[in-house]
Amino acid sequence: MSCHPQTPQSPSQFSPNTSDLMMSMTGSVTSTTTTLPTPAHSVNGSSIPSELTQDTAMGDDSPHKRKRDGDDMGSRAQKKVHVEDRKLGIDDLHMDVGEKYLLCRTPHPRPRPHVSEDLFEMYGLTGLAIEVARVRPNGEKNALRKTYKGHIKRLGVQGHFDEDKQDPNREYSLSHLMKLPQDVWDLQHVRGQDIRDGFTNEVQQKLSRAMTMGRGVVPRDQWDSSVLGEMGPGKGERQALSARPTAPNTPLPSAGPQGLPRPKTGTPLMQDASRSMRTIKKRSYGDSSFEGYGESYDDGADTGYSTGEGDMSSGQKRRKKVLIND
């Protein structure tokens, strides 16, 4: 028995939908055996329909339950997507899933010029494009031309613009090389020319002779030894002596047996033979540098003759007349 009063004025809290729900729940509980622990009232079926109805009514009036309109049937397809864990396919590639995480954060500037833009208008080539177009802007067909020589001459383009017609199947052309059999190609262009083979025996025998430097067949009158830095024995000494003029009656320095000058006093005996030696005393302006200037012949003395060397006039100097007073 229910403790709640059942008066005629009080409408019944049972509804057809609620009674059917309770009957289905009671039948399913009593007919189904489960291994999970269940409360005692659910096993013996001692649940009271009025209590179930009260719980259902209290659940409907719960403030935490979401409210929606009566005509809002909801989206079953959307609920199904969220409830079922299905795999995404190619159709879901463009599905909006919100902001991507760590994807495309680096900005990529648009390249210039872009292919979608009008390049003729951008670079001022619209007039030239209209002149060489096959169809004019008004729809008329432009006169066909074989070449663009007239436009090239008018623009003043440098170079030779006439094509040079050649036989495409000529020897060593691209088509000729492509048509060569494999064995012929290996024989002509591969065998004996591989870099891994190195030098042949014949080349190695001639290599030492080819790398040796010599005079060769240059004529003697055109050969210049100074280019190679070669100086024969005594040549450099003679050139140095002939290049410097000497004072009158100045003795020449004596040379050794090999053409080298005699070492001076106070200099080391062992010197480099390939190094040229100074043959003339270095000019100086000390007290000893004027030695010998006053020891020359006096023009006023009665010498009788003169060699004439160092004199600006040519020929021998005349003897001076000596007056004898009686």
From Swiss-Prot:
<keyword id="KW-0804">Transcription</keyword>
<dbReference type="Pfam" id="PF08633">
    <property type="entry name" value="Rox3"/>
</dbReference>
<dbReference type="GO" id="GO:0003712">
    <property type="term" value="F:transcription coregulator activity"/>
</dbReference>
<dbReference type="InterPro" id="IPR013942">
    <property type="entry name" value="Mediator_Med19_fun"/>
</dbReference>
<protein>
    <recommendedName>
        <fullName>Mediator of RNA polymerase II transcription subunit 19</fullName>
    </recommendedName>
</protein>
<keyword id="KW-0805">Transcription regulation</keyword>
<dbReference type="GO" id="GO:0016592">
    <property type="term" value="C:mediator complex"/>
</dbReference>
<comment type="subunit">
    <text>Component of the Mediator complex.</text>
</comment>
<feature type="compositionally biased region" description="Low complexity">
    <location>
        <begin position="1"/>
        <end position="35"/>
    </location>
</feature>
<comment type="function">
    <text>Component of the Mediator complex, a coactivator involved in the regulated transcription of nearly all RNA polymerase II-dependent genes. Mediator functions as a bridge to convey information from gene-specific regulatory proteins to the basal RNA polymerase II transcription machinery. Mediator is recruited to promoters by direct interactions with regulatory proteins and serves as a scaffold for the assembly of a functional preinitiation complex with RNA polymerase II and the general transcription factors.</text>
</comment>
<feature type="region of interest" description="Disordered">
    <location>
        <begin position="217"/>
        <end position="326"/>
    </location>
</feature>
<feature type="region of interest" description="Disordered">
    <location>
        <begin position="1"/>
        <end position="84"/>
    </location>
</feature>
<keyword id="KW-0539">Nucleus</keyword>
<keyword id="KW-0010">Activator</keyword>
<comment type="similarity">
    <text>Belongs to the Mediator complex subunit 19 family.</text>
</comment>
<feature type="compositionally biased region" description="Polar residues">
    <location>
        <begin position="41"/>
        <end position="56"/>
    </location>
</feature>
<dbReference type="GO" id="GO:0006357">
    <property type="term" value="P:regulation of transcription by RNA polymerase II"/>
</dbReference>
<feature type="compositionally biased region" description="Basic residues">
    <location>
        <begin position="316"/>
        <end position="326"/>
    </location>
</feature>
